[in-house]
Structure formats: C-alpha cells, structure tokens
Amino acid sequence: MITDFLLAFSILAVSTTLGVSNLNKQCRDLLQCSIQKKCVNLPVLSKLVDGKNISAEMYDDIDKYTDYGCIFTTGCQDECNDCPLCLTSKLQIVDILSGEKSSAECPTLMDCALKCVAESNQDIFQINKCLRQDCAFHCFDGSCPKCSGFITRVFNQMCAAGNFRQKIKGYSGPCYEMFHEIVRAKFADRFEKNGKTRGHSG
C-alpha cells in the first residue's frame, strides 16, 4: 500500500536546493541502481513499448512499472540517501502526509499534493488517485523544472537500458525528447487548456 503511494508521489519528486548539473553527478549511482535492483520492471516495459507508437498509455505503463518505493527504500536506500533530491523527496512525503508545506519551491505542485491529503480523509488509495489524476501534470507544466528534470533522468536510464529508441515505432530521437513526447501525449488536454502546446520534461 505505501509503495503504491510512493509510486504516485514519485511523479512529483519535488524540489531540492541542488541544480541540474549537480544532480547528474550525485545521483548517477541511484539511477543505475534503479535498473540493477529492478525497481524499474524493464522486461515488462520493453515488451509494452516494442513496436508501439508514443501514447498516453505508454506514460501509464511507465508509471505502473516504476516502483519508487524500491528506489527510496527497499532497493536503493543507500544510493537514495546519497542523492539529495531523492532524500529530500522522501522527507517531503512525511511533510505532505502530515499536512505541512516545508518548501517554497514548486508551490503549485505542493499545494495540489497537500489538497489531496486534506480532502482524502486519510484514505491512501484516494491520495494515490488524486496525485496521479490532479497533481502529476504540475511536474511537467513548467512550474517545477526540478521535478521534471529528475523524472526525465530516471526515464533516460530505463530508455537506454531497455533500448527503447530502437523499439518505439516511428521514433529516432534522443531519450529525453521521447519522454517529452510521452508526457505531451498523456497531458495533451491540460496543456491545451493552459494555452501550452508543449510540456516540460527536463
């Protein structure tokens, strides 16, 4: 149950004081561990994307088969603790569940997550659903670039390890642009509603 919540909250992977350049160096071991310890179910994802066009369903599959509970604790705890962004995200989960706002960064994302908790009546499944349906978009709408940057790097690792560039139909660009297109497919209606045709995925 708690792993499901961590998975939903991972899409939020909220702020840190580190910039993107430091993230690459300090979190490289964590990203590699996520593949080595099978926190990402790469065999299943590789089959699901093989021969498929980019779609919203592809985003849902990546979400479903990436276990951030494993990344945060059971599989890559040491690597997570050495990566300030990952450690910060774990600590913020506690703050979110207690209804506290510990950071002034990514206010739209944080406010959405806090609202999910406040209106959930402590129902973890309702929190999970709310975060996925209402809040994940704010990781990619340009209001929280550190969130989108981190999630994109997790995807880049699975993309390279799973050879997604050779498997996804009609796509030959780099992994980070692939994820950008997947995010855009998932949240197309919300980007259009907000007057944006393209999202931000790092």
From Swiss-Prot:
Cellular component GO terms held in the UniProt record: membrane
Signal peptide (from-to): none
Transmembrane annotation, as ranges: 7-23
Glycosylation sites noted in the Swiss-Prot or TrEMBL record: N53
Keywords: Glycoprotein, Membrane, Signal-anchor, Transmembrane, Transmembrane helix
Disulfide linkage: none
Residue numbers on the Cytoplasmic membrane side: 1-6
Regions of this protein lying in the Extracellular compartment: 24-202
Entry annotated with the keyword Cell inner membrane: no
InterPro entries hit by this protein: DUF5332
Membrane topology qualifier: Single-pass type II membrane protein
Subcellular location: Membrane
Protein name: Uncharacterized protein C29G2.6
Organism encoding this protein: Caenorhabditis elegans
High-level lineage: Eukaryota, Metazoa, Ecdysozoa, Nematoda, Chromadorea
